[in-house]
Design a protein with these regions (language model features):
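Strongly charged
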Residues: 2-142
Length: 142
């Protein structure tokens, strides 16, 4: 962990992507390397998904499953975001795991990580499946 924090501390400030901004409650990007813990927290919280897609079986009949968006708590959001960051870090070419994770966190802060695409995909599926929430609630009442 100390290697990751040292890399974040010594890295140049991230060039943020306006299409994928960090959350507004954190300090601006040029100040982030001064406090690597906030850097790490800002990257994780910014890429964390708001919902997950749960497949409800037996609602549509015929063996088909119905996607239903379910809101996530803070701990679940952060855990999912960290899993996405680690899976993206595994695909990097650096030799040490700490270097790969640190570079992936920097890529998240700059809006270049594949975790942003995963987040966008999950949110897009959640928006398209939001009408299914009512269907499952009506089924339960019967």
């Amino acid at each position: 962990m100390s290697i990751i924090l040292d890399t974040l501390r010594t890295a140049p400030p991230p060039q943020t992507n306006p299409a994928r901004p960090l959350l507004g409650s954190f300090p601006p990007a040029p100040i982030l390397p001064l406090s690597p813990i906030q850097y790490l927290t800002a990257a994780i919280d910014s890429v964390a998904p708001l919902v997950k897609i749960r497949q409800q079986r037996g609602v549509m009949g015929g063996g088909a499953s119905l996607p239903i968006p379910v809101p996530l708590g803070v701990k679940q959001r952060r855990r999912t975001a960290m899993q996405w960051i680690l899976s993206s870090a595994d695909k990097r070419k650096e030799s040490r795991l700490a270097d790969r994770v640190a570079r992936e966190i920097i890529a998240v802060a700059e809006g270049k990580s594949s975790a942003w695409e995963r987040r966008a995909t999950v949110h897009k599926m959640g928006v398209s499946a939001r009408s299914n929430v009512r269907l499952t609630m009506m089924r339960r009442r019967r």
